[in-house]
Amino acid sequence: GCTPEYCSMWCKVKVSQNYCVKNCKCPGR
């Protein structure tokens, strides 16, 4: 699974290929 904390980390680095970025609500994306 993908925890909010883990998603938040990927949102910060903006790795668009990562499934967390695709499946989580990232601010500004």
Swiss-Prot record:
Keyword Ligase appears in the UniProt entry: no
Tissue expression per record: Expressed by the venom gland.
Intrachain S-S bonds: 2-20, 7-24, 11-26
Cellular localisation: Secreted
GO molecular function: potassium channel regulator activity; toxin activity
Keywords, comma-separated and alphabetical: Disulfide bond, Ion channel impairing toxin, Neurotoxin, Potassium channel impairing toxin, Secreted, Toxin, Voltage-gated potassium channel impairing toxin
Cellular component, GO annotation: extracellular region
Misc. comment: Negative results: has no effect on Kv1.1/KCNA1, Kv1.4/KCNA4, Kv1.5/KCNA5, shaker IR or Kv11.1/KCNH2 channels.
Function statement: Reduces potassium currents through Kv1.2/KCNA2 and Kv1.3/KCNA3 voltage-gated potassium channels.
Annotated family: Belongs to the short scorpion toxin superfamily. Potassium channel inhibitor family. Alpha-KTx 20 subfamily.
Annotated domain remarks: Has the structural arrangement of an alpha-helix connected to antiparallel beta-sheets by disulfide bonds (CS-alpha/beta).
Full protein name: Potassium channel toxin alpha-KTx 20.1
Organism: Tityus trivittatus (Argentinean scorpion)
